[in-house]
Amino acid sequence: AFGTKNRHLTVSLVRDVLDETNREHLPGKQYWHQESAYITLVMGEELERSFYHQLCHIIDTRVMGTTSIYDDWADLNPDGIDYTNRYHFSQTETIDAWFSGDSRIFIDPYSMSFPREDRARILEYAMMPGNSEMFASETMQKKLATLCDGIRQAFDLDDTTTYLWEQYLITPEK
């Protein structure tokens, strides 16, 4: 698995990525070939965010293969709030309050699709500057803390270093 000895991550920058299934242009994609991970990214404004998003999918493979911390990820959402388990859904399935302020549950409607997309959006925004408001709610703090704990467990990061993806964690006063 990625993160172990002799495993590689290759990143390719391209002009376009076309999803052959639904003929949509994508900002990037990730995949595995044998024991190596690959990320393909479209050059442009969203390059950095897309890199973090696709990297999270690679990291997820390691976290889910070595820990059980994500097993109850859906339980981090308030009661009655479920993932749609599909990428295309109508706006009537969302409530604006779920995406803002102290009641934020998701980064955006896309993050409602699957738990893995929720985690990828969280890492994507956690790695970028100026996003503290995205993580102000109790639900988003729980999700971010679980994501960070998963990465620490999977990659044996038990030191006291605060990593970039942890910059928006609010830690209680001791």
Predicted features by range, described:
Residues 1-8:
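Zn2+-dependent metallopeptidase catalytic core
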Residues 10-174:
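Active-site-flanking segments in enzyme catalytic domains
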